[in-house]
């Protein structure tokens, strides 16, 4: 029976381990951007589910206490010393992690990135939660659908080096002129997936742009912070908050009207898929363009020319369904 226990790395870092039975033959590290984030906690549940299905797998769930590349580098060095079999990482910086991950691969450790990617030379494959262009369009559409006359919107992202959010924002910017000409993107700010900083950045946007109609936050931390700012500032009906959110964390803001709709994929499936992919690499399956990989009950993926694949399309949550999904994740 797998269970959670604490893995102490340093006084500045925290981690939890989902420990398999003593007979476990594979150690797979699920390295996240930061601990204490509901999205990654849900992914860890999926990782545990995959380990149970596969059998003989020990999942180490770990990450820094704040979303920094430096924190992840320290953790990866510790995992190399532990001689884990695979590292599956959601990165805080696509380039800064490459040297330490190359070191891991040189030691025979399999490396994949998921959610937030690592540069190709620092991993063997990458699993996107969804198609990048589709996510970019979705986050804009979530705002535009409730702005028939158009208007000013701003984006509150995670860190300025976050691979996934930067790609989604770039995709959003590209489709604005063609598909959403009435939407005016006035600013992009960064809350570093920290609730206090995200709150301050949201307040700054509202103060700096008095005609702001929507805040788009493609981060589960930032979207909650922005919705709380709108709620506390009596701005419901004036500023709509949308983006990517966990239904369980965000239901109250759909209910009170500070948000009309948000989207996300299933983070449980994402962590589950990361473990399945790592397990297959450990077993000798080669990551190369065109290669097909099973991700268990989630389905199958095919790697593209960059050894990347997407898991699923984003799903929209609004008043009609958020009650149901808030009970799941």
Model region roles, listed by residue range:
Residues 13-23:
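C-terminal segment of classical bacterial N-terminal signal peptides
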């Amino acid at each position: 029976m797998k269970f959670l226990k604490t893995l102490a790395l340093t006084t500045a870092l925290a981690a939890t381990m989902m420990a398999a039975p003593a007979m476990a033959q594979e150690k797979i590290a699920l390295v996240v951007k930061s601990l204490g984030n509901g999205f990654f906690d849900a992914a860890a549940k999926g990782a545990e589910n995959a380990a149970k299905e596969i059998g003989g797998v020990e999942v180490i769930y770990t990450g820094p206490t704040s979303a920094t590349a430096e924190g992840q580098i320290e953790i990866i060095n510790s995992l190399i010393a532990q001689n884990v079999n695979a590292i599956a990482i959601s990165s805080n910086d696509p380039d800064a992690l490459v040297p330490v991950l190359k070191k891991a691969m040189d030691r025979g450790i399999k490396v994949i990135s998921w959610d937030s990617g690592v540069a190709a030379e620092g991993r063997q494959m990458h699993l996107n939660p969804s198609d990048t262009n589709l996510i970019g369009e979705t986050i804009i559409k979530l705002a535009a659908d409730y702005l028939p006359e158009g208007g000013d919107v701003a984006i509150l992202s995670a860190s300025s080096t976050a691979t996934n959010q930067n790609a989604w924002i770039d995709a959003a910017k590209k489709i604005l002129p063609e598909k959403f000409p009435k939407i005016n993107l006035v600013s992009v700010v960064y809350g570093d997936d920290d609730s206090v900083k995200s709150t301050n950045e949201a307040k700054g946007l509202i103060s700096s742009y008095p005609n702001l109609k929507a805040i788009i936050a493609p981060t589960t931390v930032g979207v909650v912070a922005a919705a709380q700012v709108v709620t506390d500032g009596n701005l419901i009906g004036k500023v709509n908050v949308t983006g990517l959110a966990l239904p369980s964390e965000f239901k109250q803001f759909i209910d009170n009207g500070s948000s009309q709709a948000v989207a996300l994929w299933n983070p449980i499936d994402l962590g589950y898929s990361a473990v399945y992919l790592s397990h297959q690499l450990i077993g000798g399956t080669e990551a190369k363009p065109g290669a097909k990989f099973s991700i268990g009950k989630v389905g199958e993926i095919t790697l593209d020319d960059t050894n990347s694949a997407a898991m699923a399309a984003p799903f929209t949550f609004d008043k009609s369904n958020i009650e149901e999904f808030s009970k799941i994740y």
